[in-house]
Design a protein with these regions (language model features):
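Conserved acidic donor-binding segment of nucleotide-sugar-dependent glycosyltransferases
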Residues: 287-288, 292-300, 308-313
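Short acidic/histidine- and often glycine-rich active-site loop of Leloir-type glycosyltransferases
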Residues: 121, 263-265, 278-293
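Donor nucleotide-sugar binding/catalytic pocket of nucleotide-sugar-dependent glycosyltransferases
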Residues: 63, 127-162
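A conserved mid-protein helix/loop that constitutes part of the nucleotide-sugar donor-binding site
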Residues: 21-32, 177-200, 213-219, 300
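Short His-centered aromatic/hydrophobic patch
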Residues: 71-75, 92-99, 114
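Aromatic "clamp/platform" in nucleotide-sugar-dependent glycosyltransferases that forms part
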Residues: 236, 255
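Short hydrophobic beta-strand element within catalytic cores of glycosyltransferases
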Residues: 44, 272-275, 285
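A short, well-ordered alpha-helix in the C-terminal region of glycosyltransferases
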Residues: 301, 308, 315-330, 336-342
């Protein structure tokens, strides 16, 4: 059991992302986790209602901001004013846009967070960097020329309990294996390939939980393939634990995926995982041990992996067992939060010791 660490730190988060998305969801989850440790926090973000409500419920100070590029300099002045008023120990910028808006003349260290292989041009005003995978940390070190400033900060897969849902809520039967996709509806995520797989797996049903620019295209594709009666597009959902609870398999068929927190969430929830050898999964998923991996865009291999799990309970149990071990080693909520707090403290100490 991880020892719970508390801290008197004061952190300002700048979050300029969309209202939905895996990285944006993790930002909110981490702010909640830090709040539970008693850390004082200020958040500057877009005023998405579910985000604003989460901060208000916890008494976290929130400043709304639009982060429009054409209004950048007035908003930078506002950010500077907020930081001077709140006097945080460290400013944590989540992803590209937030990092590009942070002013250059702050008296606090600035951390830029990478959920992917981002261009460092947006991180010019950051003193330190954090990547969610080992390879992203390598990328940061090489691109910045400052590998000692690049920290590893995994996301966590721990999910709070949600009100239960039933398959019938989505028009899906109880007597067929259910494959769950938690993903944006975007070409990068390989949703089209999963629909093609569904056409070859007539005894399985599919729950697609996500939103995005290609949603209507995928709905049309499901109709064209004749699988619409076995596929439910549920839109973006915040009750990930409840959805995983009704799933037999969790799938991540991405073409591009720097990590994919759903990997760790499936391990936490005890749901067998099928993924592609995208950058994140191939670093952390061991084929045949804690997940099944297929090559990117390899339809036959994806179909085979899904089909194997549908008929081989022993295989599923083995993946669940070892997935739980990987989760506990690297992606457990309390340990990930503790490591972040320790990293914050290290950055603050290094900054004020004169290391710039």
């Amino acid at each position: 059991m991880t020892k719970v660490q508390s801290s008197s730190l004061n952190i300002c988060h700048i979050i300029a992302g969309a209202g939905t998305g895996g990285a944006e969801t993790f930002c909110l989850d981490m702010v909640k986790a830090l709040h539970e440790r008693g850390i004082k926090q200020t958040v500057i973000s877009r005023p998405h209602q579910h985000v604003v409500s989460a901060f208000a419920e916890r008494g976290i100070t929130h400043y709304p901001m639009g982060f429009q590029r054409w209004w950048k300099y007035p908003q930078q002045r506002k950010i500077r004013s907020i930081i001077r008023a709140e006097t945080p120990d460290l400013v944590h910028c989540w992803m590209n846009r937030a990092s590009s808006f942070v002013p250059s003349d702050l008296s606090q260290p600035v951390l830029g967070w990478f959920g992917g292989y981002y261009d460092l041009k947006n991180y010019r005003n950051c003193d330190f960097y954090m990547g969610v995978t080992r390879d992203i940390v390598r990328h940061i070190g090489e691109a910045s020329g400052k590998p000692d400033r690049a920290y590893l900060g995994h996301t966590f897969g721990t999910l709070a309990a949600d009100p239960p849902v039933r398959r019938s809520d989505f028009g899906l039967p109880d007597d067929k294996p259910l494959v769950l996709l938690l993903s944006r509806m975007h070409w990068k995520k390989g949703v089209d390939l999963l629909l093609e797989a569904a056409a070859q797996l007539p005894d399985m049903v599919f729950l697609m939980a996500g939103d995005g620019p290609d949603l209507e295209k995928y709905q049309r594709q499901a109709n064209q393939l004749g699988v619409a009666d076995r596929v439910c597009f549920a839109g973006w959902r915040h009750d990930r634990a409840a959805l995983l609870n009704i799933a037999d398999i969790c799938v991540l068929p991405s073409r591009y995926e720097p990590f994919g927190t759903v990997i760790a969430e499936a391990w936490f929830a005890g749901v067998p995982l099928v993924a592609t050898r995208a950058d994140g999964a191939k670093q952390y998923v061991t084929h045949e041990k804690d997940g099944l991996l297929s090559d990117i865009d390899d339809l036959d291999m994806l179909v085979d992996n899904l089909g194997r799990l549908a008929i081989d309970p022993a295989l599923g149990n083995r993946l669940i067992k070892h997935g739980k071990q990987t989760y506990e080693e690297l992606f457990e909520r309390e340990s990930v939060t503790s490591r972040l707090i320790t990293n914050y403290e290290d950055m603050i100490a290094r900054y004020h010791s004169g290391l710039r």
